[in-house]
Amino acid sequence: MLDVQWNQWPETLIVFLKWRLTCSKGEHLPETAGDKCMDKTPTLLQKGLAEMFGTGVLVLIGPGSIPAALLLINGGNGKAVFTMADLGFIGLAFAVAIAAMVYTIGHISGCHINPAVTLAFAVTKRIAWNEAAVYIIAQFIGGILGALGIALIFGASAASTIGFGPTNFSEAVTSYPQAIAIEALGTFLLLMVIMGTAVDGRAPAGWAGLIIGLIVAGEVIVMGPITGPSLNPARTFGPAILQVLFGGSYNLTHLIVYFVGPIIGGILGVVFYDFLTRARAATASKAAQNLQEASA
């Protein structure tokens, strides 16, 4: 704290108030006070570690809720049929994990915790490609670490019984193109919501984590019986790989669906949102120009 002498308290109070004001604005005073603000710009390493942590928590809680549900339904004796209530609670687990991470690491890395989000932002030049590469590597590592957490909780033997929660689909019911289209649609909707609540500066402050979590929960309920859904390559990759490594079974060719679909859908979602916002800006500009010409 500041070294206050009673005969200097007015000046000290002014310095302290300026320090608090600059901290709240994310600015810095000179070394005497500004170095006390905990808002320094994160390094790329810090951002990568935040993405790894966030993705790990997402996988631990989201996919981790699936073996938890199976354990309660049938005592861990294999597959079971989920009810809408089961899907609802699994969706809620994803929503809680996403909201918690948005509010925890959003100010550090932006809380992508999803390679499809990072790639979409890189393609639309919202993040540099070298930074995107670090994010994506960190996200996949985080997905693996999250799956290791699931193995720690339920035991390695769970890989061959209740599994580690990777997304999957039945080829007898759903073709690869249909599964890719479903994943693309789901990720398209997710990115539209992310853009509208977290990226667009006109969005109400403080709601992004909750709303993004809720759209994922809704998609889990609707698309869960068909493809999972994944909406996130790292979310599926970690549990799938660890499930196989620990003696369980998983058709790794299904990863094609959970990579291609989210990447396509994510890019389309950002591009479409940009189109919508540019269209509004162009319309407003044209209206202002017409008004100016009419008043001339």
Please place each PLM-identified region on the residue numbering.
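Tryptophan (W) side chains
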Residues: 6-9, 19
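Compositionally biased, low-complexity intrinsically disordered regions
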Residues: 9-10, 33
